[in-house]
Amino acid sequence: MGKPEARSGWRNAAAAAWVLVAVACAAYMHWHLRRETMDRAEERLVSMCEERARMLQEQFGVTVNHVHALAILISTFHFEKFPSAIDQDTFAKYTARTSFERPLLNGVAYAQRIFHHEREMFENQQGWIMKTMKRQAAPPQDEYAPVIFSQDTVSYLARIDMMSGEEDRENILRARATGKAVLTNPFRLLGSNHLGVVLTFAVYRPGLAADASVEERVEATAGYLGGAFDVESLVENLLSKLAGNQDIVVNVYDVTNASEPMAMYGPQSPDGKVSLFHVSTLDFGDPFRAHEMRCRYRQKPPLPWSAITNPLGTFVIWMLVGYIICAAWSRYDKVSEDCRKMEELKTQAEAADVAKSQFLATVSHEIRTPMNGVLGMLDMLLGTDLSMTQKDYAQTAQMCGRALITLINDVLDRAKIEAGKLELEAVPFDLRSLMDDVISLFSSKSREKCIELAVFVCDDVPKVVIGDPWRYRQILTNLVGNAVKFTERGHVFVRVCLAENSKVEANQVLNGTMNGKDGKVETTANGAFNTLSGFQAADERNNWDYFKLLLSDKEPHMDELECDRSYQNDCDCVTLMISIEDTGVGIPLHAQDRVFTPFMQADSSTSRNYGGTGIGLSISKCLAELMGGQISFTSRPFVGSTFTFSAVLKRSCKDTSSDSKRSLSEALPTAFKGMKAILVDGRPVRGAVTRYHLNRLGIVVKVVNNLSMGLQTLAGQNGVKESREKLSMLFIESDIWRPETDILLLNRLHELKNNGQVHELPKLVLLVTSEADKDRYGSAFDIVMYKPIRASTIASCLQQLLKVVMPERKDNQNRPSFLRSLLIGKNILIVDDNKVNLRVAAAALKKYGAKVHCVESGKDAVSLLQQPHCFDACFMDVQMPEMDGFEATRQIRQMEVKANEERKALDLMEGSTFVESHLPVLAMTADVIQATYEECIKSGMDGYVSKPFDEEQLYQAVSRLVVGTKESAV
């Protein structure tokens, strides 16, 4: 009992001591901060007072210097010139015009030194008599100082003897004895009623030495220059230019008589003691007078809040420290409780993630299932006998449905990316064929807009690479689609090269190291830019000089065209740099920071004018990062945009299956190998792109700027002579063709043939961007080729033009007939709870001769597939009532295992060959997330077909399964 009491008493004593220490610390801090504040205030007062005193002296000195200069002027032009070059009018005009140099002087006047014996002659010469300050005749005295020249502002001083006044006489005597400016006592100036002083300066005759004695100065004195100095105006002007005037009070005193200082400026000092006060000495150059400036604060410096808040805060902190120590264990208990709650939240978050996946699966299935029915029925409708109007309506509805499916897929892709469940494939694919396929998607749109659309792949890029072609295509489709959408004139140019080459060449262009140029954008003679279309591009590095570095230094050899350069290297990674350049509207500067934000567009008008949801770029950025690259852009409003992304892929190894490559690309024909052609194109970038596609077919191309040069090349002029018997084609760009003049050049072709210079006329091919160009110029040519050009489309046109017979490839057989031979008579079971989907799938398979049986539940499917059965394949919906597709497939596999075991035992007893029974089961669902695919494989399904599917997807899947079943049976 005693110990707790003692402990309590000790705690009370410690608490009291703690409070006393806290109070002492706070009190000391208050005193210290208050002392520091007063010291800083005093330092500031001293600084401001000294600064004002220094500037006052400087301004006073400047005015004195101007008066001194005026004295020298009088000495020079009044005494050295005979007759004098200065009279009253001259003096008045000069002083009036130069008064801006003496703003603090009310006026200046010059008084000449006259001895008594010269007075009569002087007065006769001037025509007036000297007067005193009281306007009376000057009494006789040893010498006089009558004012002979005066500024108009002090014209009342004319004829007055300045020696008649006692104080003025003393100033004159001191001024000529010292050679310096001397001042009077302060007095009220006439006119302004301001306090001021009279400044007097002696004027000496020329030739006075600088170290002259007093007697020599007095002897050489010729007159006196004086002016009224407005001290109040001087100080007011000074203080108006300085900061802090509202804080301090300035007084200027004449302290020649220290016991009775005379105020020259400022209010009267308050009665009582002033806490902060500073005196600065003023030196106005008069050795006989003393002046000083006295400064004080207008109000007592306030006590800073820190002197109150800091001590109070310190006291509070001391109190809080004690409280914190006491509350430490309580805090520990609270942290333990928070940890427990966090564990619960973690469990809830994991459950939410599972729920999110289930929600995505459900939403995907519920949306895509009816869309599958809509699109399937539209496909079936288009296969019937429709009028043109009905067919147009159905095709429009089909296009809208596919656009909706694309949007759904984009949203689901974004969700899969955020959930970290998007995986990339690694399969070999032909990069150049894929690029051509992407460009072909937008060919009709580019022709409608009359814009150039082209693709170029550098020679050092491998032909076959390993990666995910579908995701690679998705990025390209998004970027090229945006470029075409936002471009109304000019071009869209897709370029693929190796990243390491792209960086080096771009730096060379940026630093201006190529061909001795300064790195500026090169233009043609007519002012157009050296780009694909002649319009300016956003990225100024992408000019012709940069593009030349991407081209091979020599024409590709025919042998090189046949072999795949990717097989010359071992399997390794390659980083591709793909840029999509357009000359569209560009991206506004304020919107460039949110370009890759999902569902965000530049502004509200973007969606109205161009459509779209703003999710494509976000997905493209995520996919590029998943491929080990990144995406960036350069955009200039009303000029265009250039999007660049990189992707890390693998080179295809030597042992890569040729069948895999054939399935991913269409082999180009070799019938055109060795042919020669001339391309007439005035734009070097576009000409290089066209030559690239022709070179892929084995055609050797020479590019010229105009048709005249082409004919000269054809005729063997300018030192160039092509092999005439092999020159098969003459390609001409539509914007180069000038019918009124170039038709004469074509007539020249016939003359060359008639003269024997050309054995056979080449075929004329016109390259056009739109239907209008074909209608305008096409009649003069053998064939018109629409852009964007691809190697396959060129081959098709040239086959028609040159009547070239190409061997039919095995894989170019009639696909429907081939599939009919595979599927005819096959028994296929379709399981789906949606009757519309059943009709769509059944119609697609029946079209190729398959025998289709449909059921609407998993239980019915299990009953029909009891061993033995007659079905060759089964399409199984995943989400169905009562029994879903997963459970139905598991039961089917269990029945197969049991039946195979029984059959195997029976075959062993009979000595016959055992053939395992396996029914191909393909998942058929609208759920496209990775978790569903994994569940399909886990349950025993053989494949996966997502809804909405088309006929192509159906027959490819079935043919693969049927062929696989045949091979396993053999």
From Swiss-Prot:
Extracellular side: 34-306
Cited InterPro entries: 2C_system_His_kinase, CHASE_dom, CHASE_sf, CheY-like_superfamily, HATPase_C_sf, His_kinase_dom, HisK_dim/P_dom, HisK_dim/P_sf
Catalytic activity as recorded in UniProt: ATP + protein L-histidine = ADP + protein N-phospho-L-histidine
Domain of life: Eukaryota
Modified residues (Phosphohistidine): 365
Topological region Cytoplasmic: 1-12, 328-970
Record has Ubl conjugation as a keyword: no
Induction: Highly induced by isopentenyladenine (iP). Induced by cis-zeatin (cZ) and dihydrozeatin (DHZ). Induced by cytokinin in roots.
One Pfam family here: Receiver_CRE1
Molecular functions per Gene Ontology: cytokine binding; phosphorelay sensor kinase activity; protein histidine kinase activity
Positions bearing 4-aspartylphosphate: 877
The UniProt record lists the keyword Phosphoprotein: yes
PTMs per UniProt: Activation probably requires a transfer of a phosphate group between a His in the transmitter domain and an Asp of the receiver domain.
Domain Histidine kinase stretches: 362-651
Record-annotated Response regulatory domain positions: 676-802, 827-962
Name the record gives this protein: Probable histidine kinase 6
Species name: Oryza sativa subsp. japonica
Annotated gene: HK6
